[in-house]
Design a protein with these regions (language model features):
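Intrinsically disordered, low-complexity acidic regions enriched in Pro/Ser/Thr
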Residues: 1-175
Length: 175
């Protein structure tokens, strides 16, 4: 864990080259972490939107993988942090007693993370207990303001946000 370079040891069983995808089921939305090499789903869990935004802007020790109740330990995730380099986004975490390093191509990660945020931003929730709710927020406006501040602070992310390829339900998502 805590490797700092863009180079990963290919034969290290704790290092996974991954993709982040938006997964929707009806009104439910969560992140899906898929391992590229064989298409295996590593995690199909809630992705915390505060930490997702922080990971887009830089490094964070906020838990990215969590439970819908926002308690990462509830879903078995511990000691999480994310780091961003020029080409990679790197999540380090402990899951089921193993230290794992999840590496994402930065551009693909940004596109997927923005799609997840855009889904929430464009689908205000109606049911704060069961709908498409980022549970970290009491009011939709709090979430919307955080997204707007992120976009205002990063012209690059704002340009990607406004590009037509960032759809609210990209290919590879659920129904």
């Amino acid at each position: 864990m805590n490797k700092t370079s863009d180079e990963a040891v290919d034969d290290d069983p704790s290092v996974f080259h991954c993709t982040l995808e938006l997964r929707t089921e009806g009104d439910w939305c969560r992140g899906l972490v898929r391992v590229d090499e064989d298409g295996r789903v590593l995690f199909d869990e809630w992705v915390g939107t505060r930490a997702l935004i922080a990971s887009l802007l830089g490094n964070t020790q906020e838990p990215v993988m969590t439970c819908s109740c926002t308690v990462p330990e509830c879903a078995g995730f511990y000691d999480q942090e994310s780091r961003v380099s020029e080409n990679l986004v790197h999540w380090s975490l402990r899951y089921e007693g193993r230290d794992l390093d999840l590496l994402f191509d930065r551009n693909a990660y940004e596109d997927a993370a923005l799609a997840i945020l855009k889904h929430f931003r464009s689908h205000p929730w109606e049911d704060a207990e069961f709908g498409t709710v980022p549970y970290e927020y009491k009011e939709f406006e709090d979430f919307a303001k955080l997204v707007d501040n992120m976009l205002a602070s990063s012209p690059r992310l704002a340009e990607k946000w406004n590009a037509p390829q960032i759809a609210t339900r990209p290919a590879g998502g659920g129904s």
